[in-house]
């Protein structure tokens, strides 16, 4: 449910940012997307009432966007804050009970979500570059840096000790749509004159993001299973140490009583 909410918020961010920077009329698309975002957040609220603050924050942000009281950079940064707060919930959910220790698998899952975040921003920026070259003056370095961040995160997860999650990500990188998307990202970094139908790029990159979203969901399930196993083991360990300490205490008490008794009540010869 959290991953779905993040997905919808990222989509809304892309449309909001595109509309703000270009002359495109995306009001209908934005309205439809906001409804989808609201539906995802509503489901999330059924599970966690703390997300009401996220809903309020988003409502204020939308009002600023609609009334043009916000810059394009602020649009991105404010949506990133919302996504980050939801990612933090993943940490809170996937923390071993009463130990407060975040699972290593959870850290890997969060990295995949962050990679997806970078990919979503790349889709938005390159879409704008295809629609309106002037809208992205000076953004080439940003595209290059986002792509570097994305690759760094993906490489870290693939080389991690969590074999199951690493294998999931390897399969994602080998998908044909994924290869096409990143070939074009590299082309956008090398060339100033991009020749591609904007709708085709949006379709390809969106499919890749959806594939990565599915990978995130599967990785989250793996992390949850790992958490359950770790929690069960933690409970067993705690019970073992509890009974062990009780046994030691009983043995010590027995020896103390024996010694005291022998001192004050020596055996008669």
Model-assigned labels for residue ranges:
Residues 1-249, 253-265:
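Hydrophobic alpha-helical segments
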């Amino acid at each position: 449910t959290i991953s779905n909410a993040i997905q919808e918020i990222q989509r809304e961010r892309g449309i909001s940012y595109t509309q703000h920077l270009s002359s495109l009329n995306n009001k209908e698309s934005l309205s439809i997307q906001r409804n989808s975002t609201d539906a995802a957040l509503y489901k999330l609220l059924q599970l966690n009432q703390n997300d009401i603050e996220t809903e309020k924050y988003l409502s204020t942000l939308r009002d600023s966007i609609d009334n043009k009281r916000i810059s394009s950079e602020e649009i991105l940064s404010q949506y990133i804050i919302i996504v980050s707060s939801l990612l933090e919930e993943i940490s809170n959910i996937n923390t071993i009970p009463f130990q407060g220790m975040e699972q290593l698998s959870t850290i890997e899952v969060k990295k995949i979500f962050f990679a997806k975040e970078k990919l979503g921003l790349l889709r938005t920026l390159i879409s704008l570059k295809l629609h309106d070259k002037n809208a992205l003056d000076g953004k080439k370095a940003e595209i290059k840096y986002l792509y570097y961040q994305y690759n760094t995160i993906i490489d870290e997860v693939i080389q991690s000790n969590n074999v199951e999650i690493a294998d999931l990500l390897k399969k994602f990188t080998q998908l044909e749509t994924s290869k096409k998307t990143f070939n074009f990202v590299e082309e956008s970094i090398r060339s100033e004159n991009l020749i591609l139908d904007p709708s085709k790029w949006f379709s390809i990159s969106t499919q890749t993001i959806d594939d990565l979203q599915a990978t995130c969901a599967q990785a989250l399930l793996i992390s949850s299973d790992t958490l359950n196993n770790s929690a069960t083991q933690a409970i067993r360990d705690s019970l073992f140490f509890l009974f062990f300490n009780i046994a030691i205490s009983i043995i010590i008490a027995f020896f103390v009583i024996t010694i005291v008794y022998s001192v004050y009540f020596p055996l008669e010869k």
